[in-house]
Amino acid sequence: MLEYGFKDDSLSLHTDLYQINMAETYWRDGIHEKKAIFELFFRRLPFENGYAVFAGLEKAIEYLENFKFTDSDLSYLQDELGYHEDFIEYLRGLSFTGSLYSMKEGELVFNNEPIMRVEAPLVEAQLIETALLNIVNYQTLIATKAARIKGVIGDEVALEFGTRRAHEMDAAMWGARAALIGGFSATSNVRAGKRFNIPVSGTHAHALVQAYRDEYTAFKKYAETHKDCVFLVDTYDTLRSGMPNAIRVAKEFGDRINFIGIRLDSGDLAYLSKKARKMLDEAGFTDAKVIASSDLDEHTIMNLKAQGARIDVWGVGTKLITAYDQPALGAVYKLVAIEEDGKMVDTIKISSNPEKVTTPGRKKVYRIINQSNHHSEGDYIALYDEQVNDQKRLRMFHPVHTFISKFVTNFYAKDLHELIFEKGILCYQNPEISDIQQYVQDNLSLLWEEYKRISKPEEYPVDLSEDCWSNKMQRIHEVKSRIEEELEEE
């Protein structure tokens, strides 16, 4: 493996083999430079949630900026996988020269609407599919899970503690960033803190107490070396040993330390948090926080709150960073138009499963916002050249059950797509994480509460324009007619 300098010197091979096989087919057939349009979207909202939070654009930008096959990549493709030298030489000069339109990170996204649109030579658009899906599928999933948890926690602090349970190192780092986009305040991952300039937070492990054998000594030694102190109190006996020793050390050190609080990592968190709060208050530490961890997620936190738990800070790890209850988003990347004789021709994929029938053509996504109450009426997918006139009433109808419709007036239409790359040139600046966090909250304020319920939310409208819907029906008819003609000829 090291023969090819395998040190992750590029991400261009972060793809499925069939992408390279298709690229060679396009190239040898001379259609590789045809302009193609692909769209990235998902079919079902994760966690049975009412919305998803888009994350992954920064990583996608980094990937596309550096999309280039290295010498070691090409040596591997030729020597080990058997690609011919002429194709290898073509790949040597390849980079991303297309355009990317995308929703911004922190945008609320919904099923069957294009999150990203790639307009590029066919071979380039094909080769980047796997990586873009890999990036968006994971990070959007984690940001959405984080937003669900934060929605339950409210104004209390949420900390990302999942690094050791993440699926690997980069997943931990980018997952930490996605968690902050979803509303978390800090991460335990120091690498993520350095890489993204985000807050880091941490306490100590049970090993510290075990190493010193008793809690008093362990807490005292920790206080001697750290100004900010959170003591983990459940190594032996939370109420009879951990809490009394934490309070003892906090009193002994006084103003020499910043006694932030205590952490509970096991046991009956509702009962223990109430007892710990009482002990802290009686000792005069009314500002000290009760921090809880231990396989938390939005459902557990809701139950703890229902039981009156006195928890101020929530450390969430495994069930966030692994998207424990739904470990895959299922986003797809589909060809919607391709160049034929100098003109763009819409393409469609048809399936016996209605939800897998794609919507053809180059499209835009608008958020239709009521100007009176500042709430969203739904998202409106239109063909690229259509004009959404906010001076006229707009008909919105369900794309499958078309009898479900409404007319909207007094609205403004927000175009959700931003130009990120134009002909291979980056023309977008990534915002700060704090700005993305605020953008999420601003977007959530547009939704009615019914769409934000943790359990059984109302379905948010994602509608097609009449032209977009008619175009889809026409393409379905054309494909079916062509198949019938071919069968008759046989």
Swiss-Prot record:
Pathway: Cofactor biosynthesis; NAD(+) biosynthesis; nicotinate D-ribonucleotide from nicotinate: step 1/1. GO terms for molecular function: nicotinate phosphoribosyltransferase activity; transferase activity. The keyword Transferase applies. It catalyses: nicotinate + 5-phospho-alpha-D-ribose 1-diphosphate + ATP + H2O = nicotinate beta-D-ribonucleotide + ADP + phosphate + diphosphate. Pfam families: NAPRTase, NAPRTase_C, NAPRTase_N. Keywords: Ligase, Phosphoprotein, Pyridine nucleotide biosynthesis, Transferase. SUPFAM superfamilies: Nicotinate/Quinolinate PRTase C-terminal domain-like (SSF51690), Nicotinate/Quinolinate PRTase N-terminal domain-like (SSF54675). The keyword Heme does not apply. GO terms for biological process: NAD biosynthetic process via the salvage pathway. Transiently phosphorylated on a His residue during the reaction cycle. Phosphorylation strongly increases the affinity for substrates and increases the rate of nicotinate D-ribonucleotide production. Dephosphorylation regenerates the low-affinity form of the enzyme, leading to product release. Its EC number is 6.3.4.21. The modification Phosphohistidine is found at H206. InterPro entries: Aldolase_TIM, N/Namide_PRibTrfase, NAPRTase_C, NAPRTase_N, Nic_PRibTrfase-Fam, Nic_PRibTrfase_pncB, Nicotinate_pribotase-like_C. GO terms for cellular component: cytosol. Catalyzes the synthesis of beta-nicotinate D-ribonucleotide from nicotinate and 5-phospho-D-ribose 1-phosphate at the expense of ATP. Belongs to the NAPRTase family. This is Nicotinate phosphoribosyltransferase. It comes from Bacillus subtilis (strain 168).
